[in-house]
Amino acid sequence: MAERPEDLNLPNAVITRIIKEALPDGVNISKEARSAISRAASVFVLYATSCANNFAMKGKRKTLNASDVLSAMEEMEFQRFITPLKEALEAYRRDEKGKKEASEQKKKDKDKKDSEEQDKSREVEEEDEERLDEDDQNEEEEIDN
């Protein structure tokens, strides 16, 4: 847990970036206003987390999940955010699935390449052994002659 109230604040760089993205070009914001928005965002996150935790506790779980957060939004009367949040969640899940599939494909490709290299290495070793055997036979034939 946080030892001081300031520890609960969101990073200023993140808040500043979000504010700049939300405002039209050329609009500035005072340090005091940025600080107020930062505190408000921190309070919102804490409140949403507390509400979501209540849903997790009702489900006898210690881990918050997406449905807990969505239920908390509804309980907090932020229904208008539920649809965009669901869309963002689906996009996130698609991205993660794509990353996982890409990672698995990369691993398969690497395994296939490694296997091909091992096969090639075995072929070279077998060819070397055949040459050595031929050389041995030739030496034996020369000795016999």
Curated annotation (Swiss-Prot):
The modification N-acetylalanine is found at A2. It holds the Pfam family CBFD_NFYB_HMF. One of its GO terms (biological process) is regulation of DNA replication. Residues 85-144 form a coiled coil. Ubiquitously expressed. Residues 124-145 have a biased composition (Acidic residues). One of its GO terms (cellular component) is pericentric heterochromatin. Keywords: Acetylation, Coiled coil, DNA-binding, Nucleus, Phosphoprotein. GO terms for molecular function: DNA binding; protein heterodimerization activity. Accessory component of the DNA polymerase epsilon complex. Participates in DNA repair and in chromosomal DNA replication. Forms a complex with CHRAC1 and binds naked DNA, which is then incorporated into chromatin, aided by the nucleosome-remodeling activity of ISWI/SNF2H and ACF1. Does not enhance nucleosome sliding activity of the ACF-5 ISWI chromatin remodeling complex. This is DNA polymerase epsilon subunit 3. It comes from Mus musculus.
